[in-house]
Every structure is written in C-alpha cells, then in structure tokens.
UniProtKB/Swiss-Prot annotation:
This is Coproporphyrin III ferrochelatase. It comes from Mycobacterium marinum (strain ATCC BAA-535 / M). GO terms for cellular component: cytoplasm. One of its GO terms (molecular function) is ferrochelatase activity. The gene is cpfC. Involved in coproporphyrin-dependent heme b biosynthesis. Catalyzes the insertion of ferrous iron into coproporphyrin III to form Fe-coproporphyrin III. PANTHER family: FERROCHELATASE (PTHR11108), FERROCHELATASE, MITOCHONDRIAL (PTHR11108:SF1). It is found in: Cytoplasm. Belongs to the ferrochelatase family.
C-alpha cells in the first residue's frame, strides 16, 4: 500500500483567550456539561494566556514528520482550527489520492480510536466524491519507540529526585461503563500493559498506575484510583518522592501542564513530597520515526513492531476511510454491542 501524503490528526486546542470558550463548547457539545464546569476548565487555560500547548507541539511534529517520511504532511484537528474537514478538502484540492492518518492517541476505545475514525468519515463526507482515501494507522502503545521514549523520560526525571522515588503512571480516566463498551476494560488493560513495558524498560519492578482528569457527576463510576487520592495514600505510607509518568498522553495537553504540573505538584509540595514529571513525546524525532514505521508496515506488509510482554493486549489495526475497526478491536465491538 503506497501513500502520497500523511495527515496528522489531533484533538485541537485554543490559541488565545477569545478561543477558549468556543473550543470547550466544541469539545463538550451534546454532553450536557453545565456552563459552570466550562467556566472552571476555561480558567485552567487562562493560566497559560488562553493558549493550549498542543497546536504548537503538533506543528513542530509536522516538521519532524516531513523530514522522516519524505511526503507532504497535513495537520487537522477535531475541535479547533485547523479543522480536519478543511484540511481534507485542501488535500483533495492538492490532488492527494491516499494518505496515512497518524492520530495523536496510542489507544483503542471510543475516545482513543473510534472518535478519530468518525473524524475521518466526517471529513471525507465534507470533501465529497473526490476525497482522498484515508488510512488510519494502527494503535501504537506497545511500539518499541513509544516504550523507549517514555522509559528515557523516566530516567531523566529520576535524576532530579531521590533514588527511592515511587514511579506512578497516569492516564486520562474514563467512565467505567465506557471502558467496558469495547470489550472488558480494553483501554485500561492497554494502559496497564504499556505501563508494564515502560517500567521494565526503565528498570522498575514495582510501580503504580493511577488515573487523572476525571469529570462528570460524582455518582458515575470512573477508573480509579485518582492520582490525587493516590498521592495522599503514598504520603500516608511515608513516601517522600514520586516520579509521575503521564503515559496516557503523547503530548502536553492542558491535563498535563495544569492537572499534573500545577495542581498535583502543589499537592505534593504541601505534603512534603518531591515530584518529578516525566516528559511526554511531544515533537521528539523518535515519535516521527514511529509514524514512519507504522507507514512502512503497511507498505511492506511486514509484521508490526511490538515490544513483547506477559499477557499482551492488542490494539486496533489500520482502518480505511472511517470504516469500523476489524474484530476483535474497538469499533467492531462497539457496533456489535449496539446492534445486540
């Protein structure tokens, strides 16, 4: 399978104070999120001048991708400019026939995969009958370079805290019902498996996994423990230093720079705990090499590059033109569950 372009598909983020509220309304449309919750989240962005770091990071990643893949690289978002619909129309107008889609999520499940599949289908509908073929690359939470980048980030963070620092992985929490939607704990099992691979690569036999950035009504069960609650448990157990690795994020979303770097760090300081936060991949050249490797797998038909571990959890295969993932992966399970 050959490609004549690459599309970097991401979440999007505001780039000025006047964009914050419209962006949040895009993100939460149809979910019944109360206005006061949007106001609270908007304040997080205002601490950074109303600018999310994600678009700047993605533009830097586009530069790295262009150098690695030797193809035109386009950039489109779900929730803010440049919108993926506009990007795909530009690709059509530029004569692109088939593009590899690299999404900034390593995971399966609705938020991690299916929503990006829906983005692809929606963008192709907007572009009409001459829309390019769009091939979403597979999940990559067990790719050797994904594991290497996070293991190296942990090693760098470890140099800034005492040697007995406790390693804590975090990922975005989701409702328990959502985690069961695509099979038994598909997303949470993938995160736990990736954490085990990264911990082993970084030389840690013992570590913790916690969840962050939950929202919604308190009566709705979400994945636990929450990282703030877990930090208190560690404090009560006498832990004096932690390394937090946000393995669920491939870039510095607001959930990383606010929820961890601001709120969790303040909690740690108040508890007398030294906290080091491991870097996310962001625009690391190896992240672009990872994408190139996923493209080469489709070009050559070769075996996927994966780090093996006990009790492996597999992710989504490549998907074409917004079609559901093939069994036994997430969108196929979702479709089957909805039709039952």
């Amino acid at each position: 399978m050959e490609f004549d372009a690459v599309l970097l598909l991401s979440f999007g983020g505001p780039e000025g104070p006047d964009q914050v509220r419209p962006f949040l309304e895009n993100v939460t449309r149809g979910r019944g999120v109360p206005p006061e919750r949007l106001d609270a989240v908007a304040e997080h962005y205002m601490h950074f001048g109303g600018v999310s770091p994600i678009n700047g990071i993605n533009r830097a990643l586009v530069t790295e991708l262009r150098a690695e893949v030797g193809l035109p690289v386009y950039f489109g978002n779900r929730n803010w400019e440049p919108y993926v619909e506009d990007t795909v129309m530009a690709m059509r107008d530029n004569g692109v026939k088939r593009a590899a889609v690299f999404a900034t999520s390593a995971w399966s499940g609705y938020s991690g995969c299916t929503q990006y599949v829906e983005d692809i289908a929606r963008a192709r509908r907007a572009a009409g009958p001459d829309a390019p073929e769009l091939v979403k690359l597979r999940s990559y939470f067990d790719h050797p370079l994904f594991v290497e980048m996070f293991a190296d980030a942990i090693a760098a963070a470890a140099t800034t805290v005492p040697k007995d620092a406790r390693l804590v992985f975090t990922a975005h929490s989701i409702p328990v019902a959502a985690d069961r939607r695509c099979g038994p704990g598909l997303y949470s099992r993938q995160v736990a498996y990736a954490a085990s691979l990264v911990a082993a690569a970084a030389g840690y036999d013992d570590y913790d996994l916690a969840w962050q950035s939950r929202s919604g009504p308190p009566q709705v069960p979400w994945l636990e423990p929450d990282v703030a609650d877990h930090l208190e448990t560690l404090r009560a157990g006498g832990v004096k230093a932690v390394i937090v690795c946000p393995i669920g994020f491939v870039a510095d979303h607001i959930e990383v720079v606010w929820d961890l770097d601001s709120e969790l760090r303040a909690q740690a300081q108040g508890a007398g705990i030294a906290l080091a936060r491991a870097a996310t991949p962001n625009a690391d050249r190896r992240f672009a090499r990872l994408a190139r490797g996923l493209i080469e797998e489709l070009r050559s038909g070769g075996e996927p590059a994966r780090v093996g571990g006990p009790d492996p959890v597999f992710g989504c295969l490549a998907g074409i033109n917004g079609e559901p993932c093939r069994p036994p992966h997430c969108a196929a399970r979702e479709t089957a569950a909805q039709g039952a």
